């Protein structure tokens, strides 16, 4: 069995890699200097780059559906849903900028959570294997705990985060149990 992997085989996942790289850049920007406008702009630029790449690939006519490592299938429907996820994330990051601006401390981490959740959602729609599906689902849902409880000064926000954590943990356990019944 051949386990070598070249960069050309990973090319269909470049939009997801752009979003993941943007989250790393945002983390570094926060570590170096906290600037809410710079972090928000970097997030929007990264999401736009990924959306433009998907739109270009979809409309150039040179795209061939690709199976990446047997775990992800990138076809026109996958790219359409990834594009819709990016548009929704762009709307969320743009609209949340003014809302988060009113908070005094730790405004920038919301964008890291958003980018990680978007990367998980983009991988989720491309997954073609249960292991990739579950890992992508968790990558998408775990940052949502933090986003729900982000304004922890409000009791409803913290309560929502804890309730979602319990509900999601139960759902993940049931999902794993179902996968074990199918494959075991």
Stretches found by the model and what they are:
Residues 1-184:
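Alpha-helical transmembrane segments of multi-pass membrane proteins predominantly involved
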């Amino acid at each position: 069995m051949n386990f070598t992997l070249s960069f050309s085989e990973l090319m269909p996942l470049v939009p997801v890699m752009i979003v993941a790289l943007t989250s790393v850049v945002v983390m570094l920007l926060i570590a170096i200097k906290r600037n809410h406008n710079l972090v928000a702009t970097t997030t929007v630029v990264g999401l736009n780059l990924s959306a433009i790449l998907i739109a270009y690939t979809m409309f150039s006519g040179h795209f061939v559906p690709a199976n990446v490592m047997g775990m992800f299938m990138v076809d026109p429907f996958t790219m359409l849903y990834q594009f819709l996820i990016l548009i929704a994330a762009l709307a969320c990051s743009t609209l949340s900028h003014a809302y988060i601006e009113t908070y005094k401390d730790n405004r920038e981490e919301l964008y890291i959570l958003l980018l990680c959740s978007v990367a998980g959602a983009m991988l989720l729609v491309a997954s073609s294997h249960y292991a990739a599906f579950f890992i992508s689902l968790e990558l998408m849902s775990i940052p949502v705990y933090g986003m729900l409880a982000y304004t922890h000064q409000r009791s409803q926000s913290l309560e929502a985060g804890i309730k979602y954590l319990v509900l999601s943990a139960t759902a993940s356990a049931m999902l794993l149990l179902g996968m074990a019944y199918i494959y075991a």
